[in-house]
Amino acid sequence: MAVKLTNLLKNLPRTAGVDATVREYEEGFRTARDSALEDEQRAERKVNDLYYDLVTDFYEYGWGRSFHFAPRVPGESFKASLARHEHYMAHVLGLGPGMVAADIGCGVGGSLLEIARFSGARIVGVNSNAYQLERARRYAADAGLAHLAEFLNCDFLHVDAPDESFDAAYSIEATCCEPDKVSIYSEIFRLLKPGACFAAYEFCMTDRFDPQDPVHLKLKADLQLGGGLLEVVAPQTIDDALRAVGFEVLATRDLALQTGPSVPWYQPLAGSGFSLASFRSSRVGRKVTDNSLRALEALRVVPRGTLRVAQTLNLCADAMAEAGRLGIFTPMYFIHARKPG
C-alpha cells in the first residue's frame, strides 16, 4: 500500500513524538560526528536508527520502496532505471536459484525483492532498523516472495550469521551509513564463503571535490546532515579498505560517468524533464509537499515536527542535486571484489 501524505509519521515507533525525535536526531548527529573514538560506534547506531525511523515514510512517499538512485538512458522510466540498476548487481554476482546472498542494508526490501524475483536466489536482508524490517517482511509476503526473502535485525558490524554463510553479498547505497569502511568490509568478508564475491554502490566525494572550497564543504555538510551520514569518503578510501581486509578488487568505477546519451542520476531531485512519476521527488514537488505539510500540521492532521523532517530531507536533496551537477559527489561508485579461496 502506498504511503499517503496524511499518514506520514503517524506510526512512528517512538513515544517521544516526531518533533522531539527530530531534535534528538539533530543533537545525536552532532554528538556522533564529534565523538571520541570509543563512543563512535554507539553514537552511530543511535543516529542511524533515529534517522530511518523519521525518514522511511518520506522515502516511500516520494521515491518508492527501492531507496537508491540510478542513471537513465533517454526514454527509460524512473522505475525501469531502478530495476535495471538492481538487475545489474544480480548479474555481476551471478545470482541464481540455489544461491544465498546477503543484502547489507536492505531498507524496506524493495531492491531485495526485485533481485530475488529476477534471479531466483534467496536473499537475506540485514537491517538494524525494526521499523523498516516490519514493512519489508509484509511486502515480501504480499509479493508472494517470502520463500526467497529472510531478514535479520542487526547492525552491519555484527551480523547475526556464522562465518562463510553466503554465496554472495551486495549493498545498494547502504554501507554509506558506516564511515569505518575497514570494519564494515571486514564483516562482509567474514560472512562470505571462500571465492564468493561482494558488490556495492557506494556514496563518494569524487576527485573533483575540493576540501578548501567553502561551497563544496557546505554541500557536503548539508548532504551529511540531511542524509544521516557521518562521513562521505573518497573512492581511494573505498579501494584501500577493500584490499586492507583481504578482498581481491575485480572492478571499481563511477557509474555516474556514463558514455553516450544519458539522464543524470540527480534529475529526479533537480526536477528537469518533468513527469508525474517523478513530481514528488522534484524540487517543485518537494516545495508543494512542504506547503501541504505546513497546513496539515496546523490542522493537526499530521504530527508536529513532520514538516521539519521534510525540510531536513530537502536539505539533503538540494545538496545532492547540486553536488551531482558539479560532479563532486556520486551515489554509485561501483565496487566488485572477491574473497580469495
Language-model features: locations:
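Conserved SAM/SAH-binding loop
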Residues: V108
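Substrate-binding/catalytic lobe of Class I Rossmann-like enzymes that use SAM or dcSAM, i.e.
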Residues: P211-F329, R338-P340
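Conserved alpha-helix/loop element of class I SAM-dependent methyltransferases that forms part
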Residues: R65-S66, E76-M99
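A short glycine-rich, Lys/Arg-flanked "PGG" loop and its adjoining helix->strand segment in the class I
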Residues: V182-C197
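N-terminal auxiliary segments of SAM/dcSAM-dependent transferases
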Residues: A2-F58
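Class I SAM-dependent methyltransferase SAM/SAH-binding core
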Residues: V100-A102, S111-H158
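A short SAM/SAH-binding and catalytic strip from SAM-dependent methyltransferases
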Residues: D167-D180
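A short acidic, Gly/Pro-enriched loop at the edge of an enzyme's catalytic core
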Residues: L157-A168
